[in-house]
UniProtKB/Swiss-Prot annotation:
InterPro entries, sorted: aa-tRNA-synth_I_CS, aa-tRNA-synth_Ic, Rossmann-like_a/b/a_fold, S4_RNA-bd, S4_RNA-bd_sf, SYY-like_C, Tyr-tRNA-ligase, Tyr-tRNA-ligase_bac-type
Stretches assigned to the S4 RNA-binding domain: 354-411
Naturally occurring in which organism (per UniProt): Blochmanniella floridana
Keywords: Aminoacyl-tRNA synthetase, ATP-binding, Cytoplasm, Ligase, Nucleotide-binding, Protein biosynthesis, RNA-binding
Protein name: Tyrosine--tRNA ligase
Keyword tRNA processing: no
Molecular functions (GO terms): ATP binding; RNA binding; tyrosine-tRNA ligase activity
Domain of life of the native organism: Bacteria
Motif interval(s): 'KMSKS' region: 235-239
Enzyme Commission no: 6.1.1.1
Positions contributing to ATP binding: K238
Binding site for L-tyrosine: Y36, Y175, Q179
Length: 422
């Protein structure tokens, strides 16, 4: 049991913003509460950007509070404009409902929805109340509480209004009202007094708190977790490239494991605090001893892969990594190669007599022929663990292991297994 959940989350770097910390702390320490976090079905899987709020909910549940998970069957049809440069592609109702079914299964991996006690989590869908609300009710009973002056002064709205190519549609403009009403509805019908979300949701959360104050004359609270960003400080999202999904069919356990292995040193310890249950004292102690930071990524990768893909997924990822990074490729059996493909190693099917440049571009180890030539010339390319620096190299029969496979590598950590179409 976590004694003081707010202090605990602050210690682990899991809070970006919070409303009225002192009052919220007092409420949390006096009684169990109901809180919620919303996830819009904008894809058929959650991604690693969703892990921080999910694990925050899990920690509140461990502290004895009841989490609700709101899936945006309605808001997902509209699209959140927060920190998006252009309007999202609108999805059909049938598509979003299919995605919701898959996302429910993923959420159940992290949050206890079956304990049958006071802190048991529940999953709800805002389509259940928005689908029965007519436009007059929405405009008269909700819209009257919102000032256009305040709405257009929000950073994201101002940014989109200045964009001559995209601007913002009334559809997306109304998203803030819908998410705000979600909080008011859940407050009234489920007694939820706290909403959590990513820090990009701060404005929407504050609007919901204000709406509850106006409609019911009651206090509610908000808390945001830090956004997970990549090396260039860009938020991970479904429309960004290189998204790391929680679905093993979209991002294999091996690829998932390698993502955490390859993060920058500074982020490794930060994520150990946010995503694992290793004590902060142990993390700091280890950090002080490990000046090279070499082990933090491996500890993080093991914990995260087991959390999302289980022990079996972790074993698969570690086995592939061990074989590839120890240069044991020539010692693998034919069955091992079959298993590597099943385990999710990046692979591609090519015709014989393919050039090295073509293989590099088709395998996405290079983005263009010119970049492929640069990598070859820089001595960054190996074929079956042997360096290859001939720019016009054509694959030979001797490059095919079991006459079927070739391991192409760029640098130390980027691989693709070629399957030859014989």
């Amino acid at each position: 049991m976590i004694d003081n959940i707010i202090d605990y989350l602050y210690e682990r770097g899991s809070i970006a913003q919070i409303t009225d910390r002192k009052k919220l702390n007092a409420v949390l320490n006096s009684q169990p509460i109901t809180l919620y976090c919303g996830f819009d079905p904008t894809a058929d899987s959650l991604h690693i950007g969703h892990l921080a709020p999910l694990l925050c909910l899990k920690r509140f549940q461990k502290a004895g509070h009841r989490p609700l998970i709101l899936l945006g069957g309605a808001t997902g049809l509209i699209g959140d404009p927060s920190f998006k440069d252009s309007e999202r592609k609108l999805q059909s109702f049938n598509t979003t409902q299919k995605w919701i079914k898959k996302i429910k299964l993923q959420i159940a991996l992290f949050i206890d929805c079956n304990s049958n006690n006071a802190s048991q989590a529940h999953i709800i869908d805002n389509y259940s109340w928005f689908s029965s609300m007519n436009i007059l009710t929405f405009l008269r009973d909700i819209g009257k509480f919102f000032s256009i002056n305040k709405m257009i002064n929000k950073d994201i709205i101002k940014k989109r209004l200045k964009n001559d190519n995209y601007g913002i549609s009334y559809t997306e403009f109304s998203y803030n009202l819908m998410q705000s009403y979600d909080f008011a509805h859940i407050y009234k019908h489920y007694d939820a007094i706290l909403q959590i979300g990513g820090s990009d949701q701060w404005g929407n959360i504050i609007s919901g708190i204000d709406l509850i104050k106006r409609m019911y004359k009651k206090n509610a609270y908000g808390l945001t977790v830090p956004l997970l960003t990549n090396f260039n400080n860009i938020k991970f999202g479904k429309t960004e490239k290189n998204t790391i999904w929680l679905d093993p069919e979209k991002t294999s356990p091996y690829q998932f494991y390698q993502y955490w292995i390859n993060i920058d040193d500074k982020s490794a310890y930060h994520f150990l605090k946010i995503f694992t249950d290793i004590s902060v004292q142990d993390i700091n102690s280890f950090k002080n001893r490990d000046h090279s930071y070499s082990q933090a990524q491996y500890i993080l990768a093991e914990n995260m892969t087991q959390l999302v893909h289980g022990k079996r997924g972790l074993n698969i990822a570690q086995r592939i990594s061990q074989n590839l990074f120890s240069y044991n490729i020539l010692k693998l059996t034919l069955n091992d190669f079959h298993q590597l493909i099943q385990d999710g190693i990046p692979n591609i099917i090519l015709e014989t007599n393919t050039s090295l440049q073509e293989a590099l571009t088709k395998s996405k180890l290079a983005t263009s022929r010119s970049q492929a030539r640069y990598f070859i010339k820089s001595n960054a390319i190996t074929i079956n663990a042997h360096k290859q620096s001939k720019i016009e190299y054509i694959f030979q029969d001797s490059d095919r292991i079991y006459n079927l496979y070739t391991l192409l590598k760029r640098g130390k950590k980027n691989y693709c297994l070629i399957q030859w179409n014989i």
